[in-house]
Amino acid sequence: KGGLIDASNGGSLPGATIYSSTSNKGTISDFNGNFSLDGLKAGEASIKISFIGYATKDTILSISEGENDLGILKLNPSSLGLNEVEVIASIANDRNTPVAASTLSGKFIEDNIGNQEYPEILRNTPSIYVTKQGGGFGDARINVRGFDQTNVAVMINGIPVNDMENGRVYWSNWAGLSDVTSKLQVQRGLGASKLAVPSVGGSINIVTNAADFEKGGSASTTVGNDGYTKYAVALSSGEMSNGLATTFQFTHTRGDGYVDGTKFRAYSYFLSTNYKINEKQSISGTILGAPQWHHQRYGYGSYDNLHLSDYSDDATHGRGIKFNHTWGTLDGEEFNFRRNFYHKPKAFLNHYLDFSENTTLKTSAYVSLGIGGGTGPRGRVQNDSGRVYDSFGGYGVGIRDGNGQIMFDNIVAYNQGNYSGFNDAPNTAPNTTTSSGDGFIRRASMNSHSWYGILSTLDHKLSENLTLTAGVDARYYKGEHYRRLENLLGNTSYVSRSDDNNPDNEITVASPAEFGNFLDRSYRDGNNVLNYHNDGLVSWLGLFGQLEYKNDDMSAFVSFNGSQQGFKRIDYFNYLDDAAPGSDTAQATDWQNFLGGNAKAGFNYKLNDNMRVYASGGYFSKQPIFDNIFLNYVNNINPDAANQTVTAAEVGYGYFDGKINAS
């Protein structure tokens, strides 16, 4: 018998495999990391201990008659710097941290994800609701305790990924995460994060793989329904003699989608490097991204003349649950008015410094760049009687065939003056169109952003049981929002009259929606901008501190943090270029600053090795989102913009053994 712990932090290792090739006997460790291997013969025995994420331990033991106590055995993490990343990410210990948390290992995700979307792996987690929404690739959303994603903090390696303007999370931007996740943890309620993040409903902490200690590689293929195919390859150099270790992973995923007209294609890449400078200092770098495009099933309105019965299997009226009213074919290929495309790479540079056994400094600098958007229709079809089928009031009516698919080839012919079959609606201005004229184009609503930040945490052990933590969280974000012409659909140009500085802008350049292209500057070079063009700027400075007490039976903490967020809007369409700075007609507003933060406290008491009780509570003051500060999509400042405040308290009981984990 014996026990297994993590050599880096002393945590128990449940579910590890212990196997003796000498006697062909094996077992697994229980929830506390303890194990008992029976049936070994006296004499020398070969023992192999393995656990996902840890270096395999091989040893030869001398076994005597009777019980043999091996004591506590330590396993070293196979990924370098992984424990430090978990500290930055505020990963809770399921039995010692006074929050309700559920943790999934990378091995569990790998074994169970299949061709599900990343959030769907959490659908059986308490207090979690996951839906695929329209059914497009990456369009899933998640609710924690009923709160939507704007009130759930999502963090990768401790770095927040909620949009800096509206707090949303777009899972299609992170399609490759399931392949590189080391640990996924959901904390319900205010959670254990030290940052002033929007964790009213809870937080989702994702820790990615780090550079692997062992040299090796792997390749895999996954196939599924509706043409789903995924190829993956991973390579690791292992730790080399110069202290450098590098791991690389790449995937390609494609399919037709379960819902009609929702074809998709996605790539993902991951590169992590760790360098051990000396015994007290190391650095690591990680880059990950997932360029993708996918067709969507967009919501419908009453003007589309659609009803729930259209999605039934009724032979008379229904078209089935897969019905999608936004797609058709163009030149024999699938074409959809609604297409999402994006590329959002994120890079981390982490530095770990041990001043002494009692004092450590962990710093993560990061940058996130994003470009892409979503397409939709623009224009109208109008007949002699004045009936209009336009992009606002029924683009699915009058232009669909008997199967409910949009007749895109006919739209192209109509735009060129060669077709008049839409309810006898002749095109009065072929080969050109405006939003108030005849014909359709496909536009793309774009979001191009740059996000820079640094997170630094200092930990100091005041005593054997007491630890003080303090840190800084600084961020700067700039988001550029505009629409561009994506497909002329047979027209030669599109006339936009929305720009006060260029009221008769004839656009002839179309920029295809293929992934997210950082090199595409046609919206500037070709003046390909329509409907709107504005920038959103957000600055963030936060300070945090925590005092934690811990012994064998209990733990308690109290934490405080505060942040200042600044918001600024620049509008290039609704205000003239030569307007006086600082005036009511200026393109740029002044910075609008808001203070916020939270205070939390909690304690956890272990009744025995299997049971615990805990309590926590806190007060949270959350700054308003960008759109609640600037009204009506212009520079009008909301005089009533104010923080949201939340007071929360929680009492809980937890039970753990080798088979049951209840809280």
Q: Where would I find each of the regions flagged by the language model?
A:
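A beta-strand signature from Gram-negative outer-membrane beta-barrel systems
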Residues: 73, 175-218
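Extracytoplasmic beta-strand/coil segments of soluble accessory domains associated
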Residues: 119-160, 176, 182
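Membrane-embedded beta-barrel scaffold of Gram-negative outer-membrane proteins
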Residues: 360-366, 606, 612-618, 642-663
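Short acidic/polar hinge/loop motifs at secondary-structure boundaries
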Residues: 36-39, 110, 141, 160-188, ...
